């Protein structure tokens, strides 16, 4: 029984599904998808639970959410192993994900008060007040690269605001989704407040098509995000928050410390085996001898990166990709770039047939036309050389995406110029692209999202504002508008 609907674990009535470790092939999880009727059942449960949950005080809802944080802490080792085994990422990285989940609780509570709390301004004859109300029933679609942390970034602020939720994890990480749901169950969420439906495309389409849905919060690919946007078009009454990845540029201008710059680039491009929406996909490198030396060092260090299993000792920097198919897609993308005229500096290699262990790849595309503006979700870095900083900015902006942009340079003036001209929601200076703060908004423009940033701003799309003018008594104004006469003679 792998679905959690209205406070009960039930068996899915859809297709059967098996999840294996992407490196060892070990069977980790077996279950069945939710069919359309069970998705509707989850929605009815969430709708029925909404009035009571929304009427609780923030303090009462916060108690449950903080209890969940405590359970994350006490079950950290177990959840770390589940995430690592299911995604293929190393144990150390899965542990940082669980830590991020724990930290998200306090940050979300603070963000609720700052972004969507209550305000009151006194007036001579009363007060002006601002409150925020929950939308109602929200669907949350989770991705596979951070199956705990990223859905958590939607679920926690949505629950704090008073919404009820139907959560569909990625079909590639059902075990992690179930493990997190069981902790919410232990935290004491009332039946129907948070419901779990497992499944792939058919389950997702049934969920997003629900008429009685008040909103949908999504993290995933641009293709799926665009499909959801089209599906919900003409329904302005539903809140839609999309985070859809990027084709992110990292500009390496002047480099004082080559080793430090190489380290930053590897952290930006290859951490999580390149499976972060924030990963650098395009390296824009200044022409000249210094750039040549940097590139040679980058290739040499990257060549020594050997992916390993989640529990290997010593721990590897990267593990496997989410699946063998995902790894093969990266290899295919590299082969296509090479066929277009790209010059391979480091060829990505599948280390073992039947696994997702893929070494990083680096390919130079300077002077090659018609390169697809697509996000290759894996450890493949494309390199372009430039002559002037203005040219670098034009190249950085030459994408339909707009999530992340980074600059390595000792010159503050160039960063200031980039801040003015970059078309990206997050712009970093001498910091990895894969570094972002939960105390700041997270999101992009263009094909990277629909102007609903998450993290610190997630509270904004989890509630709507209600403004009020208030007075505890009603009296006739001392001064009336022209044409109004309330004299005793007229009244009688």
Curated annotation (Swiss-Prot):
Name of protein: N-succinylglutamate 5-semialdehyde dehydrogenase
Domain of life: Bacteria
Function: Catalyzes the NAD-dependent reduction of succinylglutamate semialdehyde into succinylglutamate.
Binding annotation for NAD(+): 220-225
Active site as annotated: 243, 277
Family matches, as Gene3D superfamilies: Aldehyde Dehydrogenase, Chain A, domain 1 (3.40.605.10), Aldehyde Dehydrogenase, Chain A, domain 2 (3.40.309.10)
Recorded GO MF terms: succinylglutamate-semialdehyde dehydrogenase activity
InterPro entries the UniProt entry points to: Ald_DH/histidinol_DH, Ald_DH_C, Ald_DH_CS_CYS, Ald_DH_CS_GLU, Ald_DH_N, Aldehyde_DH_dom, SuccinylGlu_semiald_DH_AstD
Enzyme Commission identifier(s): 1.2.1.71
Catalytic activity field: N-succinyl-L-glutamate 5-semialdehyde + NAD(+) + H2O = N-succinyl-L-glutamate + NADH + 2 H(+)
Pathway: Amino-acid degradation; L-arginine degradation via AST pathway; L-glutamate and succinate from L-arginine: step 4/5
